[in-house]
Amino acid sequence: MQDDINEGSDFAANASSPAEVAAFFQNNYPHLTIADTDAINKEYPLMPPLPEHAAYFPSASAAYGEATFTCPGNYISLSFANALPPDKVWNYRYNVLQASNVAAGLGVPHTFESPAIFGLGNADDDVNSSYATYNSEIIPVVMLYWISFVRDLTPNQYKYGSAPYWDSFGDGEDGVKTILLQTNGTIMDTIPEDQVERCDFWRGLAIIMEQ
């Protein structure tokens, strides 16, 4: 399972106020009550500004990304790890920055890793993107992890030579592990504790949101 660091940035409303964040969430999840959206705004207060966006876009983006992609992915990983041998489940976070995305206030948006998985020009991407220049070195790292999954059902047997060993997710008893994929800086990591707490919050709303 996976998530990009800024999963919500391509989808979130360009909100100027907590009320607009609340309206955005109620439009997407109509069973949410006013009390629910008040709680969401409390979990995601005003954040540092991002280029080309209104004041509460960062909050809307972070909330939507975690509610819709990141936290469900983490819980699916944990569910598989509890149902299968936990060493058969892997999780990653993708943090490859492209200057144009950063300048547009999008960070690392949903599915930005696709060209690294399938190769430059094979994923409806711009061949003039950063993957052709300063992010080119992440391509063999990511691609060979995926090829190894296909060939061996694990990411490590056929991984790129200098890429780190990708530890399995774990069973949640002693924390869980994820790999942080970054150009010239891929490392093993853990899911941040503050994100774990926010995911617990979203889990409490899962039935209402039909997630």
Regions found by a protein language model. Give the residues of each.
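Substrate-gating cap/lid region and adjacent catalytic-acid/histidine neighborhood
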Residues: M1-T133
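Mobile gating loops/cap/lid regions near enzyme active sites that modulate substrate access
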Residues: T70-N74, L78-Q211
